[in-house]
């Protein structure tokens, strides 16, 4: 087994931003149509790779809410900006740790980000609920 670099994780929860936006929607300061704009690729990735949520959609109240994860990194090349399952992301993180053993976070490709997006398959509500940045070290 190859040596791997310890990884540093910085997690930004966007739950407060989500709550603020939903409050504005309920107060009619933001149009419902403006938050029901999931792209076809986001919906498709949520259908195939998304994990079901226990909570209902905050807009249509159906239990069709999924969490889908997208990975981004120069290190990934063409695979950057793609949706992945939790298992696939774990494998990417393992490969990333091996590839960056002995490197420093200042290298341009030594950062990987994971975006977790909440998506409703019914009404197309979507919101970036979590942003995680992973670096060696």
Task: Locate the predicted segments by residue.
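N-terminal pre-domain and mature-chain start segments
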Residues: 1-112, 125-137
């Amino acid at each position: 087994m190859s040596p791997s670099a310890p990884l540093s994780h910085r997690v930004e929860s966007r739950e407060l931003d989500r709550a603020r936006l939903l409050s504005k929607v309920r107060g009619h300061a933001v149009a419902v149509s403006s938050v029901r704009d999931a792209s076809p690729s986001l919906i498709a990735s949520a259908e195939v790779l998304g994990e079901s949520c226990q909570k209902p959609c905050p807009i249509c109240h159906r239990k069709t809410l999924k969490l889908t994860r997208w990975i981004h990194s120069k290190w990934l090349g063409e695979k950057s900006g793609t949706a992945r399952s939790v298992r696939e992301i774990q494998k990417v993180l393992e490969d990333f740790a091996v590839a960056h053993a002995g490197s420093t976070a200042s290298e341009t490709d030594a950062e990987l980000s994971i975006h977790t997006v909440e998506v409703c398959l019914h009404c197309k509500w979507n919101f970036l609920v979590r942003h995680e940045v992973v670096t060696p070290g």
